[in-house]
């Protein structure tokens, strides 16, 4: 039987991510596993088509986004620890979400990724793309997709 010991749970703070966190917490509790919550803040671009943001403003916006994400992650961890007796750590990274998730999975030797999916199909999925789908295709470990 598969018994993961280190579970990577990417979150974007959506309802789907909350479901994935709850599922991962149940799995962790049953297997005495550690949960690693990860949020990736998209790296802000300084320039758009015809406008550039001053670098100081961009850096402040990026820092504010990271601080807010860390605050939300601390809240998520507290919610988990109120109902489960499991080991939970977290981090906030800046970059391309699917790439950072895959990098963290390899670096931390995760043996399971539990990720929420919005469930879009058809043209919406094609236009918007799916972090969960990219993670599923590229991951070297099992991925549990939670809807």
Task: List where the protein language model places each region.
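Short beta->alpha linker loops
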Residues: 68, 92-96, 118
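Structural beta-alpha unit
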Residues: 1-2, 30, 78-113
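General small-molecule cofactor/ligand-binding pocket signal
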Residues: 38, 89-93, 144
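Generic structural signal for helix capping and beta-alpha/helix-loop junctions
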Residues: 45, 98-100, 122
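Small/aliphatic-rich secondary-structure junction motif
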Residues: 2-55
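Gly/Ser-rich helix-loop-strand patches that form or flank binding pockets
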Residues: 103-147
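Active-site phosphate/pyrophosphate- and oxyanion-stabilizing loops and adjacent acidic/basic residues
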Residues: 25, 78, 133
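A short acidic, glycine-rich active-site loop
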Residues: 56-71
């Amino acid at each position: 039987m598969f018994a993961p010991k280190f579970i990577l749970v990417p979150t974007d703070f959506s309802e789907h991510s909350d479901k994935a966190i709850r599922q991962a917490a149940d799995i962790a509790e049953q297997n005495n596993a550690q949960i690693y919550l990860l949020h990736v803040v998209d790296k802000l671009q300084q320039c758009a088509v015809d406008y550039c943001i001053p670098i100081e403003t961009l850096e402040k916006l990026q820092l504010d986004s990271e601080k807010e994400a860390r605050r939300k992650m601390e809240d998520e961890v507290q919610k988990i620890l109120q109902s489960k007796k499991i080991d939970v750590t977290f981090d906030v990274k800046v970059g391309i979400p699917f790439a950072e998730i895959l990098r963290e999975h390899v670096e931390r030797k995760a043996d399971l990724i539990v990720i929420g999916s919005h469930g879009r199909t058809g043209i919406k999925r094609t236009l918007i793309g799916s972090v969960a789908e990219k993670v599923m295709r590229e991951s070297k470990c099992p991925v549990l997709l939670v809807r």
